[in-house]
């Protein structure tokens, strides 16, 4: 995700600036202050040699100018809040400014995808699609853009054609790396292959399909909402009006952050501690009711109260209906067939025998982190 953020910005500056922006040598990227800190850190490092200036600020206060050619947003943002960027995107486009969005891929099973509210580039990590944390990495990114920009996408693009017998066959459709064309025209020379991780994430989507992903995302969201309601009963305030899986919690005046941290450490629970004194909690598909009980025990203990989890977690939506996804996704046949372990393993074996795999290098393979 961190690498993709700058790749998206570079794509926007390459052949995608208006004539007025090129004449003004527009080189500024606006970055919302609530982007993930690790993403901003990588962008800051990589922007310098690319001649790109980063301006960090509040997206609601952003005013487009001729020198700004792209904007980068987080959806949901670093605090966990789901923001309505529709008006912002319209304002940016009116000034010939492209909009790139770092998105949580699993949240998009429930939330309106950025492409539907006008984003030009959408990127992020595919780690949530069945990839363990691996102590922080590696994981493959996903990168999507409009069809108009396909020739400025970094990396190689695999397409489907027909062989001499009229059968479907995969081939390299676009070859924009420096191995194939002049270096000055190349869009990428990155070669840190994450093909295995991308393949694993892809099979996760194949196994679960659209309905399975909706159920997983719905369970995560319902658990986060239940936790928020129970915390409010203990006197805490949840600051995110709309959210998917992450809460930003304001502590009551009589609750000490240090006391909360000590209890959390005793319970071997990691929380996010903001400089202003708030606490962040994120839920994922591995979170069990017992984990919620432990979290509520921690917050209750810090508040000097007792708590016992004695009810099930109901399925419920806690964000505004305007954010709800209404469009279908993963409608191809492959996402509807292989929903048992046996079916999936047989499918993987068939693909391996056709060499649509990483076992041999006879089939076209991008072998590129940016094209996975």
Language-model features: locations:
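Flexible inter-domain linker/hinge segments
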Residues: 291-360
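Flexible, glycine/charged-enriched surface loops at secondary-structure junctions
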Residues: 54-57, 212-217, 231-242, 272-275, ...
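Noncatalytic alpha-helical scaffolds and linker/capping helices
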Residues: 278-288, 295-297
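Flexible, glycine-rich loop/tail regions that form catalytic "lids" or insertion modules at the edges
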Residues: 221-228, 251, 261, 317, ...
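Conserved PLP-binding catalytic core of the aspartate aminotransferase-like
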Residues: 221, 234-264, 283-287, 367
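Active-site C-terminal subdomain of aminotransferase-like
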Residues: 129-230, 234, 239-241
